[in-house]
């Protein structure tokens, strides 16, 4: 038997073992107190659970830079029979991560997709106004939302919802914009953020609170593999073709830009890698502005 067969066998064994782990119900770990007037990072999650999957950078902004992370539940899923339960699961997951939670409207926004944007401008405009109001109320330093080719219709719809809502802000409004990926990989990420083993375990644990979803499909157990593949992709997509890959175990890929003067602008040339050993303030100093 080669060592690689043993390696793959152990991976399969661990995933099988993970299917027996408890789902949710874990006590939140202790965290530093976030100042009441701390700068805010808003995660605009197309579905309950996205905050746990793409939240590696948000978790580090909370811990290393003292930002208050607020998860905005753009929708609560399309299954109306599950929406109340999904809100309860989301509340528990955010509580575990130390994220605040904000609703858009009772039950979440509906029909967040490009078809609605094109065919029902009145409905779309009302949804955009909900998001625009939240941006104005929270005045975030940083916002997270999916990139424009993230495959899932609600993810792509959320991208356009945010861009349209940003366009409704006052001319002086500015914030860092972090585009995320999950269903569809970005062709041009420019930031790879390492997560420590502890952080990955916390995100997996939080994801397990979404009991109804992971019982149906235990995708929470595959998050580490996804984050390992991000290291492979990011080594060249962010670091440059043919370049040396960073010595990361797990990472998340993002596209970092800034909204200012009514448009999105890149904030640095090329790609950046943020190791777990380097404080996020050294890479994203503007993200911590008051």
Where are these regions (language model features)?
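Active-site cores that bind ATP or allylic diphosphates and position pyrophosphate for catalysis
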Residues: 171-176, 182-183, 200
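Acidic, Ser/Thr-rich low-complexity intrinsically disordered segments
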Residues: 245-268
């Amino acid at each position: 038997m080669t060592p690689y067969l043993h390696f793959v066998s152990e991976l399969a064994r661990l995933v099988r073992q993970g299917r027996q782990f408890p789902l949710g119900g874990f006590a939140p770990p202790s965290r530093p107190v976030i100042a009441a007037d701390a700068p805010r990072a808003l995660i605009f999650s197309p579905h309950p659970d996205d905050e746990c999957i793409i939240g590696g950078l948000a978790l580090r902004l909370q811990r290393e830079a003292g930002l208050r992370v607020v998860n905005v539940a753009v929708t609560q899923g399309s299954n109306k029979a599950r929406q109340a339960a999904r809100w309860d699961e989301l509340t528990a997951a955010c509580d575990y991560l130390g994220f605040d939670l904000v609703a858009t409207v009772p039950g979440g926004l509906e029909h967040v997709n490009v078809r609605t944007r094109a065919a029902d401008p009145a409905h779309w405009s009302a949804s955009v106004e909900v998001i625009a109001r939240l941006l104005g109320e929270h005045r975030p330093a940083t916002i997270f939302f999916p990139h424009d080719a993230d495959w899932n219709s609600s993810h792509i719809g959320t991208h356009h919802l945010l861009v349209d809502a940003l366009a409704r802000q006052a001319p002086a409004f500015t914030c860092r914009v972090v585009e995320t990926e999950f269903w569809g990989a970005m062709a041009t990420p420019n930031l790879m953020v390492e997560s420590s083993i502890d952080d990955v375990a916390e995100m997996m644990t939080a994801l397990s609170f979404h009991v109804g979803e992971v019982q149906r499909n235990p995708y929470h157990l595959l998050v580490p593999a996804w984050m390992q593949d991000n290291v492979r992709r990011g080594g060249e997509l962010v670091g440059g073709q043919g370049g040396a890959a960073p010595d990361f175990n797990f990472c998340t890929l993002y596209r970092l830009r800034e909204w200012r003067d009514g448009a999105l602008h890149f904030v640095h040339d090329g790609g950046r890698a943020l190791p777990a050993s380097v404080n996020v303030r050294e890479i994203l100093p503007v993200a911590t502005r008051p």
